């Protein structure tokens, strides 16, 4: 399904914002010794709007739903054969670079996280070393009813008690790895513990155990009276659905970006001479898939570009789309910019181009060196190639999944 865009409504405020983003990226980019500081001075969106086609509509990908405030500074890790290899593995075959957040999720899923210790028990039954307390009467009462109760008066205060915080899955997580079990003895061995499924809370297990003795008033009381009203409150209806759109974008743009820099001559001394340079990006070709995920409950929009060769991304489970013949013809007209020093194709299978070159196969740049009122050199190849590489690298590092941008929308 094709989507029409009102391209004329892109105003100067958005253009100024993009100029600031590009300047921050250019200030951190490494430059050759003969290139001075690079700055974007103006941006115009042009009149040619992109061709946008809706190719998929699905649930939000799991990585978009996670809070990554604490993981913003983490770097990817290398995973080999299902094992973490953050310090460099022994076998480099068959590895992939994945976000640290996703690797940590797989690590905890396999039991290597908190409370693991090689135990195959469910998370809510893994326990630390046993301890005794004068208040074993609670535990004895629990054994008589065919259940296990936590030991210690501090179970009511929350310090070292049964529950500690609300987990991400919606069920209470156990403090210190799990409940504290009383020591077995010949007279009071461990009873059969009715283990609740992972989808149920331990409180539900206590309630089911209390059905053995309807006259027991102690077990019929809620373990956490303060939390009981919150559980009974109905959830507020969410009028905004969660959905994820996949858009195929084909854009032959006539936008214009003006960039200024300088050419440095470091002989016979560093920065002996400086020649002003003016570069104008007069157009580019973009062909890629854009993912837009909308969280209705939190009013957030996540945007990223997908790599069609990534089998583990948000669209990795979807069959590959057939390439439009018109797109092939357009790509043939504007082939990717290649290095003049690169060797010709020798007939062997070639590695795929970097994602930046596949997304932006062509970037058209005009260059001028010197002052406008004096002699000017035009079309300096090395400078133009450097600017092309910076643009492709910026798109790859800022927008290609697993990198994505999140927009927080207002309540209005």
Swiss-Prot record:
InterPro entries in the cross-refs: Mdm12, MMM1_dom, SMP_LBD
Boundaries of every SMP-LTD domain copy: 1-410
Keywords recorded for this protein, A-Z: Endoplasmic reticulum, Lipid transport, Lipid-binding, Membrane, Mitochondrion, Mitochondrion outer membrane, Transport
Membrane topology: Peripheral membrane protein
Cell compartments where the protein resides: Mitochondrion outer membrane; Endoplasmic reticulum membrane
Residue stretches of biased makeup (Low complexity): 220-238
Chief place where the protein resides: mitochondrion
GO MF, one annotated term: lipid binding
Annotated GO CC locations: endoplasmic reticulum membrane; ERMES complex
Keyword Membrane: yes
Domain comment, as recorded: The SMP-LTD domain is a barrel-like domain that can bind various types of glycerophospholipids in its interior and mediate their transfer between two adjacent bilayers.
Function comment: Component of the ERMES/MDM complex, which serves as a molecular tether to connect the endoplasmic reticulum (ER) and mitochondria. Components of this complex are involved in the control of mitochondrial shape and protein biogenesis, and function in nonvesicular lipid trafficking between the ER and mitochondria. MDM12 is required for the interaction of the ER-resident membrane protein MMM1 and the outer mitochondrial membrane-resident beta-barrel protein MDM10.
Assembly: Component of the ER-mitochondria encounter structure (ERMES) or MDM complex, composed of MMM1, MDM10, MDM12 and MDM34. A MMM1 homodimer associates with one molecule of MDM12 on each side in a pairwise head-to-tail manner, and the SMP-LTD domains of MMM1 and MDM12 generate a continuous hydrophobic tunnel for phospholipid trafficking.
Record protein name field: Mitochondrial distribution and morphology protein 12
Annotated organism of origin: Coprinopsis cinerea (strain Okayama-7 / 130 / ATCC MYA-4618 / FGSC 9003)
Lineage of producing organism: Eukaryota, Fungi, Dikarya, Basidiomycota, Agaricomycotina
Gene: MDM12
